[in-house]
Amino acid sequence: MNKTIIIPCFNEKQTILTVIQNVKNNLIDGDEIIIVDDFSSDGTRDLLNNLNDPIIKIKYHDRNYGKGKAINTALKESLKEVVIIQDADLEYNPDE
């Protein structure tokens, strides 16, 4: 069963690339990652803009709406049967 991993983020410049790599290490063929940047101002957007990966969709909010809205934005884009939400701050490591 394929899954979507949703990563809502806000000002996660220090952790976002690590989280993305950790999530990618645990994917199977057909899975997707959707990242929603909730109007970061610390350079997170610049890092995301430089990603070029066909399994990653990136959505950007035009202002800070909060985590709930970021999740809802991603859910509208999800094409898979199973959805997992992974916070960008590494509080929960996807390798564990």
Label the predicted regions:
Residues 37-46, 90:
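A conserved acidic beta->alpha catalytic loop
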Residues 83:
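Short aromatic/hydrophobic "clamp" motif used to bind/position activated sugar donors
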Residues 9, 36-38, 61:
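Conserved sequence signature across two-component system core domains
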Residues 31-34, 45-77:
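Conserved donor nucleotide-binding strand/loop of the catalytic core
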Residues 12-15, 40, 67, 93:
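Donor nucleotide-sugar binding loop of glycosyltransferases
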Residues 61, 86-88:
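Catalytic metal- and UDP-sugar-binding loop of GT-A-like glycosyltransferases, i.e.
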Residues 12-25:
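Short, well-formed alpha-helical segments that are part of the catalytic scaffolds
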Residues 2-4, 32:
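Cell-envelope/extracellular polymer assembly enzymes that use nucleotide-activated donors
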